[in-house]
């Protein structure tokens, strides 16, 4: 064998070795590439799964927040309703109590009107009844009881009850000429309308 043949053979062997090595590296690269692609697919699937779980969790959080807001609103409404019911019950109980006291006020006023203030023996008694009446009226006024004494006012059927109607040249038509019995209201609600005589 000549040098040239040996040289060609050597080159051929080197080229075969390079090709074989390239094939081996290519195969390893294919294996690494396939493994990397599989790992990427697994990670993408895991990411998709985690994103889906996150969306479900976010929906649950929104539902819980809505639920909490509704519960708070319901509690606030219940608190407000119970306060109103307690207030109504208190006012109703107070109105029944006040209605029972109205005849006492009427009787004290009748006693004051009937007493003759000119008689010396009755003056101390009259002063005591007047003081009792004033104290009594002031005390119940603290709880919202107001007197309805519409003398000279225009007749209002919400607050007045017409007992009679008379012609009068001195008064405008539909005016209260005389109050037979005072009316009372408690916290804006009429307990007893004033009994009045109205001009025609």
Swiss-Prot record:
Subcellular location: Cytoplasm
Protein name, as recorded: Protein GrpE
Alphabetical keyword list: Chaperone, Cytoplasm, Stress response
Native source organism of the sequence: Vibrio cholerae serotype O1 (strain ATCC 39315 / El Tor Inaba N16961)
Signal sequence, renumbered to the chain: none
PANTHER family membership: GRPE PROTEIN (PTHR21237), GRPE PROTEIN HOMOLOG, MITOCHONDRIAL (PTHR21237:SF23)
Complex and partners: Homodimer.
Similarity comment: Belongs to the GrpE family.
